[in-house]
């Protein structure tokens, strides 16, 4: 078993019309044993920028603390929030810096940039970025997430339709992966508001 599969995870981000959604499962396990059912994989950097981290749970928490620290330094120096593209480059640089002993996680970054244009990207554990204009996935359920998202995604969805689409994709995918699941955690971000919702899924 790969170390990336040790704790199990499923993270997906999807683009809508001037909005985006990012969702994850809530299970923290040690291989097939469930440890917690309310694990937080998605974290807010600021109101228009979120990061989801799949992979080894210890590295997820360590990397998140380092990213919050770097973003606060940026805010103090620049007196503004970081743009999503800048933040993605920062994450990539931090991961690549540790390439010989990498953080064992795969980030999914989603944010609203200039003119409220949504930005999503993912990268591997050493910071190789993969940009997308529709959706990005990571985690142990990524194979089934790709299939569900390709079947359900359509461009320029409004916020409510986007929430419904990403939720259905996530729930149907984690049912096909025994290392992730136990409900879902969804953020839908528009220029005016952030909606956070908890999904109830199969509890096994």
Curated annotation (Swiss-Prot):
Keywords: Cytoplasm, Nucleus, Proteasome. GO terms for cellular component: mitochondrion; nucleus; proteasome complex; proteasome core complex, beta-subunit complex. It is found in: Cytoplasm; Nucleus. PROSITE patterns: PROTEASOME_BETA_1, PROTEASOME_BETA_2. One of its GO terms (biological process) is proteasome-mediated ubiquitin-dependent protein catabolic process. InterPro entries: Ntn_hydrolases_N, Proteasome_beta_3, Proteasome_bsu_CS, Proteasome_sua/b, Proteasome_suB-type. It holds the Pfam family Proteasome. Component of the 20S core complex of the 26S proteasome. The 26S proteasome is composed of a core protease (CP), known as the 20S proteasome, capped at one or both ends by the 19S regulatory particle (RP/PA700). The 20S proteasome core is composed of 28 subunits that are arranged in four stacked rings, resulting in a barrel-shaped structure. The two end rings are each formed by seven alpha subunits, and the two central rings are each formed by seven beta subunits. The catalytic chamber with the active sites is on the inside of the barrel. Non-catalytic component of the proteasome, a multicatalytic proteinase complex which is characterized by its ability to cleave peptides with Arg, Phe, Tyr, Leu, and Glu adjacent to the leaving group at neutral or slightly basic pH. The proteasome has an ATP-dependent proteolytic activity. Belongs to the peptidase T1B family. This is Proteasome subunit beta type-3-B. The gene is PBC2.
């Amino acid at each position: 078993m790969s170390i990336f599969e040790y704790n199990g995870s499923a993270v997906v981000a999807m683009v809508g019309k001037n909005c985006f959604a990012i969702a994850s499962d809530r299970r923290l396990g040690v291989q097939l044993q469930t440890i917690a059912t309310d694990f937080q994989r998605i974290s807010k950097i600021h109101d228009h920028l979120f990061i989801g981290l799949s992979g080894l749970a210890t590295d997820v928490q360590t990397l998140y603390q380092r990213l919050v620290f770097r973003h606060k330094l940026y805010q103090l120096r620049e007196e503004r929030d970081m743009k999503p593209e800048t933040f993605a480059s920062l994450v990539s640089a931090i991961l690549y810096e540790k390439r010989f002993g990498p953080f064992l996680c795969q980030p999914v970054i989603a944010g609203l940039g200039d003119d409220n244009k949504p930005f999503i990207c993912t990268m591997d554990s050493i910071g190789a970025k993969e940009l997308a204009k529709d959706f990005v996935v990571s985690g142990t359920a990524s194979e089934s997430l790709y299939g569900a998202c390709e079947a359900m995604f359509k461009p320029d969805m409004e916020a409510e339709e986007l929430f419904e689409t990403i939720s259905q994709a996530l729930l149907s995918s984690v049912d096909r992966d025994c290392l992730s699941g136990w409900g879902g955690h969804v953020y839908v971000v528009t220029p005016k508001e952030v909606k956070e919702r908890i999904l109830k899924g199969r509890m096994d």
